[in-house]
From Swiss-Prot:
InterPro entries: Palmitoyltrfase_DHHC, PFA4/ZDH16/20/ERF2-like. Residues 31-45, 153-165, 210-276 are lumenal. One of its GO terms (cellular component) is Golgi membrane. The chain crosses the membrane at residues 10-30, 46-66, 132-152, 166-186, 189-209. It comes from Danio rerio. Belongs to the DHHC palmitoyltransferase family. This is Palmitoyltransferase ZDHHC22. The keyword Chloroplast does not apply. Palmitoyltransferase that could catalyze the addition of palmitate onto various protein substrates and be involved in a variety of cellular processes. One of its GO terms (molecular function) is protein-cysteine S-palmitoyltransferase activity.
Length: 276
């Protein structure tokens, strides 16, 4: 449990650091180099790049904040469950009743718990699932966009060719060797590492997004899937998606704002409210 709590502290710090570095690289290196023009200070291509980048990052950070600000904890629980040392449930959660779980990391009872997200430091459940999915979508988009811009910068600044599909398989090991031999600068080596970080985070976020969308459409949570259980509130895929994304889901695709009414405190009341 101590390792999980440590991870709960390290993961958000890693996210904040990666975000700051990404902003710095885009505005201090990538934008001035790739979109520079001798005629005007700011050209249409630069404005388009800045707009796209800020839109993607703004939505990623906005949904990240909304995921944290809308916890799925139960407001009606006054007694904190105590698990025995030989508790058969997973190490990070203990199943109670009616779709409720006690998270051993959060020390809270979570309504319709899906999983504990270490990057946000809280559990994903009925109230913040929409924001978590949109956070995953925009995080993957931001990272993959940064990957493309980073490749363009390395091509322009260091004449690295990415025409060969095998370049990504050899770039990191070769750059590591060249760096320790003193053949490339620390900045170039750092940028190569960032390419792989963006690629890794982007692909993982895409995987999370696809998994969560599938589970939401089936009306199932990750906790239920692991135990081979069907949802206690199973409905049609359209109703399940509406429960999470709301009737104004189109707005939520572009702006990190609430698009579904929730009745905090009790999942059964919330579910009955949504299906009245």
């Amino acid at each position: 449990m101590g390792k999980l709590k440590l991870l709960n502290t390290i993961a958000p710090a890693y996210f904040y650091a990666a975000t700051v570095v990404t902003f710095a690289l885009h505005f201090l290196l990538f934008t001035p180099t790739i979109f520079q023009s001798s005629d005007v200070t700011i050209n249409p291509a630069m404005l388009a790049h800045i707009s796209i980048f800020l839109f993607l990052m703004g939505n990623a950070l906005g949904n990240y904040i909304m995921t944290i600000r809308n916890p799925s904890e139960s407001a009606n629980e006054t007694v904190i469950p105590v698990c025995s040392p030989d508790c058969p449930d997973r190490i990070d959660a203990h199943y109670l009743l009616n779709g409720r779980h006690f998270c051993k990391v959060c020390k809270k009872v979570i309504l319709k718990r899906d999983h504990h997200c270490f990057f946000t430091g809280n559990c994903i459940g009925n109230r913040n699932m929409r924001y978590f999915i949109m956070f995953s979508i925009y995080t993957s988009s931001s990272c993959l966009y940064s990957l493309v811009i980073g490749v363009a910068y390395l091509t322009i600044e260091y004449s690295i060719s990415f025409e060969n599909p095998l370049t990504f398989l050899t770039l990191l090991p070769l750059s590591t060797g060249y760096f320790f031999l003193g053949l490339i600068s620390g900045l170039q080596f750092f940028l190569v590492i960032m390419l792989y970080i963006w690629l890794g985070i982007g692909l993982v976020s895409v995987g999370f997004c696809c998994q969560q969308l599938l589970l939401v459409a089936r009306g199932q949570t990750w906790c239920e899937l692991q135990k081979g259980q069907l949802s206690e509130c199973r409905g049609t895929w359209r109703a399940n998606l509406t429960d999470v994304f709301g009737s104004h889901w189109v707005l939520g695709l572009f702006v990190p704002v609430p698009t579904v009414e929730t009745v905090p405190g009790n999942w059964q009341v919330y579910h009955d409210h949504k299906h009245d």
